[in-house]
Amino acid sequence: NVHKSEEELHETAERILNDPSCGDVFRVKGFLRKEDGQWLELNATRHEICIRPAKLGQEIMIVIGEKLNKEVIDGYWK
């Protein structure tokens, strides 16, 4: 389970999208529960990072791309 603020989530997505050691990342999307129990929905590409409140969610983050390095990507969520 990952708990991050909206700012931390934005920064993490941006780093994953721009770190070549993660692979060729096209998109990062999913849901994350904040410390206060509220849900955030993330939908990020290199061109736009959209984070918005969500009424319901499931703790999941999906990284879409080619030649992805799971170990490096997972390190960003710790």
Regions found by a protein language model. Give the residues of each.
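P-loop NTP-binding site
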Residues: N1-K78
